[in-house]
């Protein structure tokens, strides 16, 4: 069934609808028709729905963030949906609501999972929109106002507001730019399948889009995908930070999964995708997201090696037939080189080879060293790096390039094409595997070395990068006046190198011998504020930038550059 038919797929059955209606009246004490809620007629633009169960101290941060919202309290409501916490949580929530007329507490029977409380929040919502927030997270000060304005402007059914990870890394592609009308399969919507989004309340109700209730893994994926398929307009608001997603120790996502119960829930999500797409490129592209993120990463590298033997066998007993049944060659084709190998080994049930591959990956070591450094008179810093990727002290990634017959490839009319294969993988044999499985040309074309400055805040600032021809001599150039603007108060930090080689990625500190950097000296006038490269006691390279001193030198450097540019134009 095509995407355009998505709305018809998301209706709950009558028994479920009746059950939810009964629970809603009990929880809210209201008998008004649901159609009177969520229309915005009350002046409430958005209902913030928070599933609550015995919250910790960070709950105060959430409430404080709601108190700071730029949207007037009369324009939004907060629904604290208590999942049977008991005392003292009940008293704590009552105290929050006592001094805030726009806060309501829904006291619910315990379900043990956030789906049921969220559903009650949607049922009770009076706002035009619903924004889901978890009890350990918080909103940025302008979030509700900006999200509602953006949804109004684009007539959005769903708005994905920019999420910021607190103590956790988050995908970045989805938030590179605002996307008023995002499309599944074209825009990176699958990068962020959390429920921390703004939804049009009437849209959820009309399409019967609800969270599964009870202990259901990936319930957020199920809910969001149903919404994505049913939505007329999905918008991404990337220009404004909206949601702080806080990593708390012991969260459900931190625990090791139980294969026998987890993967049936994954298949339910896959069922939704297949129900709303025809076989072909779009379906393959969507399915690839879960194949890569929920299966292949669990059988890779150190993670796979560290599993107890019995757990590893249980995991493979479940995922091997799932892969054979649900993910075809079209899904594999868009995977990176390491994942294509893992997928082929899984599909062939080559368990010993999977473990050998994981051990090989776990033993990979990357090191990046400065072999030469100089300043140019124009203010540029030129570094030559050597990058080594080894395993047990030897080159880990060994390639062989051979000529192939043009009739067997998509080669040009010249009659021959060169093909590069990785020959150093510890596979027992390649018999029974796809013939071009070890061909790595596509990934080698995308090899990259990038240098970053790691700030005191932990943020990484991109300094330089390139696609190297030879990892033994990687030339990069850093222009301090382009990296730092005139008012930038950065004092520098450690230099980090991120390497992509044949589909594997590494992140390592940049090293150098002190003597190599000692010959470099201080930066010239046209580099702006004085910058110095030093090697710390452990040999790690730091860029140290003068601040707040050096203002006159910075201004002079910028002025001279502007003058030179004007002369060249003239």
Segment roles from a protein language model:
Residues 2, 20-40, 300-570:
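Basic, ligand-binding patches in group-transfer machinery
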Residues 2, 7, 14-18, 22-265:
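Nucleotide-sugar donor-binding/catalytic module of glycosyltransferases
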Residues 94, 267-274, 284-288, 316, ...:
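Generic detector of well-ordered alpha-helical segments enriched in charged/polar residues
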Residues 101-103, 140, 163, 206, ...:
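Generic preference for hydrophobic/aromatic residues in regular secondary structure cores
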Residues 121-123, 208-213, 261-265, 284-292, ...:
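Short secondary-structure transition/capping segments
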Residues 208-220, 289-291, 346-357:
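A broadly tuned preference for mixed-charge, low-complexity surface segments
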Residues 240-248, 253-280, 295, 306-323:
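Catalytic core of nucleotide-sugar-dependent glycosyltransferases
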Residues 282-306:
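P-loop NTPase catalytic cores that bind/hydrolyze ATP
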């Amino acid at each position: 069934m095509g995407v355009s038919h998505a709305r018809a797929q998301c209706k709950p059955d009558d028994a479920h609808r009746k059950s939810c209606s009964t629970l809603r009246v009990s929880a809210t004490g209201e008998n008004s028709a649901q159609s009177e809620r969520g229309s915005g007629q009350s002046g409430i633009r958005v209902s913030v729905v928070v599933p609550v169960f015995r919250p910790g101290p960070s709950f105060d941060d959430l409430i404080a963030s709601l108190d700071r919202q730029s949207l007037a309290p009369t324009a939004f409501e907060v629904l604290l949906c208590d999942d049977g916490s008991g005392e003292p949580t009940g008293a704590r929530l009552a105290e929050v609501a006592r001094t805030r007329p726009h806060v309501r507490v829904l006291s619910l029977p315990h379900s043990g999972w956030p789906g049921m409380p969220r559903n009650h929040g949607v049922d009770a919502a009076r706002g035009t929109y619903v924004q889901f927030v978890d009890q350990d997270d918080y909103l940025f000060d302008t979030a509700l106002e900006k999200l509602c304005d953006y949804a109004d402007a684009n007539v959005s059914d769903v708005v994905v507001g920019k999420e910021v990870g607190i103590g956790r890394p988050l995908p970045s592609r989805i938030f590179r730019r605002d996307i008023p009308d995002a499309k599944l399969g074209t825009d990176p919507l699958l990068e962020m399948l959390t429920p921390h989004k703004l939804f049009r309340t009437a849209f959820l109700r009309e399409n019967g889009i609800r969270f599964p209730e009870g202990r259901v893994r990936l319930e957020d994926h199920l809910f969001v995908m149903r919404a994505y398929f049913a939505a007329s307009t999905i918008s991404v608001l990337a220009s404004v930070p909206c949601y702080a997603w806080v990593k708390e120790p012991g969260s459900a996502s931190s625990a090791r999964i139980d294969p026998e119960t987890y993967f049936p829930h994954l298949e339910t999500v896959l069922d939704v995708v297949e129900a709303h797409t025809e076989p072909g490129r779009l379906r393959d592209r969507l399915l690839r997201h879960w194949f890569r993120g929920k299966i292949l990463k669990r059988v890779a590298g150190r993670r796979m090696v560290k599993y107890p033997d019995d757990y590893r066998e249980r995991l493979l007993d479940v995922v091997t037939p799932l892969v054979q049944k649900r993910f075809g060659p079209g899904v594999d084709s868009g995977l990176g080189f390491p994942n294509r190998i893992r997928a082929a080994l899984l599909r062939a049930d080559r368990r010993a080879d999977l473990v050998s591959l994981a051990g090989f990956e776990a033993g990979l070591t990357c090191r990046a060293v400065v072999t030469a450094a100089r300043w140019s008179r124009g203010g540029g810093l030129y570094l030559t790096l050597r990058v080594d990727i080894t395993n047990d002290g030897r080159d880990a990634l060994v390639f062989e390039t051979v000529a192939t017959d043009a009739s067997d490839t998509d080669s040009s009319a010249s009659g021959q094409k060169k093909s590069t294969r990785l020959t150093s993988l510890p596979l027992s044999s390649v018999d029974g595997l796809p013939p071009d499985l070890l061909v790595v040309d596509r990934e080698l074309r995308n090899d990259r070395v990038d240098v970053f400055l790691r700030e005191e805040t932990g943020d990484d600032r991109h300094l330089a990068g390139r696609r190297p021809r030879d990892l033994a001599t990687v030339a990069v150039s850093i222009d301090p006046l382009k990296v730092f603007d005139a008012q930038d108060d950065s004092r520098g930090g450690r230099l980090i190198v991120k390497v992509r080689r044949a589909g594997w990625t590494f992140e390592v500190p940049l090293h150098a011998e002190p003597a190599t950097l000692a010959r470099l000296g201080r930066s010239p006038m046209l580099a702006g504020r004085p910058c110095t490269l030093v090697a710390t006691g452990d040999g790690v390279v730091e860029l140290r930038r003068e601040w707040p001193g050096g203002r006159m030198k910075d201004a002079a450097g910028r002025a001279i550059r502007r003058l030179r540019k004007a002369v060249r134009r003239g």
